[in-house]
From Swiss-Prot:
GO process annotations (BP): translation
Pfam family of the protein (one): Ribosomal_L22
Gene3D superfamilies hit by this protein: Ribosomal protein L22/L17
Phylogenetic placement of the source organism: Bacteria, Bacillati, Cyanobacteriota, Cyanophyceae, Synechococcales
Cited NCBIfam families: rplV_bact (TIGR01044)
Originating organism: Parasynechococcus marenigrum (strain WH8102)
Name of the protein in its database record: Large ribosomal subunit protein uL22
Self-association and partners: Part of the 50S ribosomal subunit.
Length: 121
């Protein structure tokens, strides 16, 4: 018995070692997951968060990959998955009173976005 599944082609892009905490990036990714490419770009343009810049860059890269590698039309693309994982933290030290030093962790994250052709309905 053979089963044939018609899955939509998926293009993805990754942004690694992006400065910013994972929780702040996930807050934005949760808003755009499942939306069309055009809707996501409009939302990202007007959101008041600093993490929208790198997310927009990764999203445009994923759409460019879909257009160049798979020949898909950008108008028909939907964000099928968007995730952020924790990257390494850069450790810095802040001088404090009486010779002490406090550690400051500058967090990084890895952003992954996958786009797929919108299913015909």
């Amino acid at each position: 018995m053979t089963t044939s599944s018609t899955t939509a082609p998926i293009a993805q892009a990754h942004g690694r070692f992006i400065r910013g905490s994972v929780s702040k990036v996930r807050r934005v990714l949760d808003q755009i997951r499942g939306r069309t490419y055009r809707d996501a770009l409009i939302m990202l343009e007007f959101m008041p968060y600093r993490s929208t810049g790198p997310i927009t860059k990764v999203l445009r890269s994923a759409v460019a990959n879909a257009e160049h590698n798979l020949g898909l039309d950008p108008a028909s693309l939907v964000i099928s998955s968007a995730s952020a994982d924790m990257g390494p933290s850069m450790k810095r030290y802040r001088p404090r009173a009486q010779g002490r030093a406090f550690q400051i962790k500058k967090q990084t994250c890895h952003i992954s976005i996958a786009v797929a052709a919108q299913p015909d309905s």
